[in-house]
Amino acid sequence: EALYDICFRTLKLVTPTFGDLNHLISATMSGVTCCLRFPGQLNSDLRKLAVNLIPFPRLHFFMVGFAPLTSRGSQQYRALTVPELTQQMWDAKNMMCAADPRHGRYLTASAMFRGKMSTKEVDEQLINVQNKNSSYFVEWIPNNVKSSVCDIPPVGLKMACTFIGNSSSIQEMFRRDATSLTAMFRRKAFLHWYTWEGMDEMEFTEEESNMNDLVSEYQQYQDASAEPXXEQEEDYEEA
């Protein structure tokens, strides 16, 4: 759904094909793994990504984005600046996930830049974004945006950026899925295909509860505040 929206609204493609969708996916995946394949000023790896992006084991569902968005075979004639890349990267229209990050808060995030650029400028831009949009970041995880810079840009581009965010707004997708699951399960639609293969109806009930618990957990950490911990410390000092 999000990929088709990007093709229609951003790339202005009238009839996007699976090739167009795969182009967006491959560009994003290439950006995620570029630090494993190319040298860079500030490299990263998948282990570091996992450690920095997953604050709790169950909350491991990410939103990804890419900037600049280009269609297949297109050539970029004007190089974007780091501020422009950063602005596009955080834009909800660039997210390849059918959830609006403005409806939640970022627990953690990672920005992977590619091309010749200053790491100082990258860090400054990310700090500016956090300061200007502090309400969209949880306050109880400080310095929760990680950055990396790879010197080799993608083919056809001079600069690019891949974004991975662990946002509580992804619960929108789980809510939609849970609503569809509940509606179909009550009618027992398509259930026989699974019971014939040895599954039990209770497994679907458990998964429905599991999904609702996941939504509640995301909401809980979205609403969590760092203030109670400070109050507890004051009480402890007084005692």
UniProtKB/Swiss-Prot annotation:
GO molecular function annotations of the record: GTP binding; GTPase activity; structural constituent of cytoskeleton
Secretion signal, residue range per the UniProt entry: none
Biased composition (Acidic residues): 230-239
Region (Disordered): 207-239
Keyword GTP-binding: yes
Keyword match Membrane: no
UniProt KW keywords: Cytoplasm, Cytoskeleton, GTP-binding, Microtubule, Nucleotide-binding
GO biological process, one term: microtubule-based process
Cellular compartments annotated: Cytoplasm, Cytoskeleton
Role description: Tubulin is the major constituent of microtubules, a cylinder consisting of laterally associated linear protofilaments composed of alpha- and beta-tubulin heterodimers. Microtubules grow by the addition of GTP-tubulin dimers to the microtubule end, where a stabilizing cap forms. Below the cap, tubulin dimers are in GDP-bound state, owing to GTPase activity of alpha-tubulin.
Subunit and partners: Dimer of alpha and beta chains. A typical microtubule is a hollow water-filled tube with an outer diameter of 25 nm and an inner diameter of 15 nM. Alpha-beta heterodimers associate head-to-tail to form protofilaments running lengthwise along the microtubule wall with the beta-tubulin subunit facing the microtubule plus end conferring a structural polarity. Microtubules usually have 13 protofilaments but different protofilament numbers can be found in some organisms and specialized cells.
Family statement: Belongs to the tubulin family.
Protein's name according to its UniProt entry: Tubulin beta-3 chain
